[in-house]
Amino acid sequence: MTVYAVTGGAEFLGRYIVKLLISADDVQEIRVINVVEDPQPLVSKVKVINYIQCDINDLIR
């Protein structure tokens, strides 16, 4: 099972990367990490997409 985490996944470039991962065959799960909640979360019928709202800078303090 291949799991990818995309930081900034609700922003312009991050959303594009998530869309590319959705279309990839070997991806089972995508974890989208972003500071703010995504107003229009992406949905896929064949991939598991988990949205995690946090600031990664808070994890290293």
From Swiss-Prot:
Entries under Gene3D superfamilies matching the protein: NAD(P)-binding Rossmann-like Domain
SUPFAM superfamilies reported in the protein's UniProt record: NAD(P)-binding Rossmann-fold domains
InterPro entries attached to this UniProt entry: 3Beta_OHSteriod_DH/Estase, NAD(P)-bd_dom_sf
Residue runs in coiled coils: none
Gene Ontology molecular function: oxidoreductase activity, acting on the CH-OH group of donors, NAD or NADP as acceptor
Biological processes annotated in GO: steroid biosynthetic process
Highest taxon in the source lineage: Viruses
Similarity field: Belongs to the 3-beta-HSD family.
Annotated protein name in UniProt: Truncated 3-beta hydroxy-5-ene steroid dehydrogenase homolog
